[in-house]
Amino acid sequence: VLCAEGCIEEVRVVGWRDSAYLHCAARIPRSVHVAALVSPFDSLVWHRPRTEALFGVRFRLEIYTPAPQRIHGYYVLPFVFGDTIVARADLKADRAAGILRVPQLTWEPGVPPEAGEALERELDDLAGWLGLADVAGPGLR
């Protein structure tokens, strides 16, 4: 119905088996400038096959995985830098200490150096939003 009404159009993406859809008002930017921690419940990463197709990264929420079998941590947020998932940060809000803890931080291969500073800014912003005073974890600051 939306295709027939001209609201969206069916498009083909190289390497994808299924069709994708593009909103008629969507504009494809020349480049993407974003740095964001993404909730594991965000629609961008919740649909795992689409996440793998878009980013070439296998993302799994490991909260129900027994601790010894976890790869990236308990509550992991992917970090998008530009148009790529470049890292995964396991986060824990330690409210008693006022610290956003990063027990584990995993970088994907080939990450540009400026991604580290961008991630630290995002972690600082998230800590502030949560009412926490600091961020602590291996490989930070």
Question: How should these model regions be labeled?
Answer:
Residues 1-141:
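Long, charged, low-complexity, helical-prone intrinsically disordered regions
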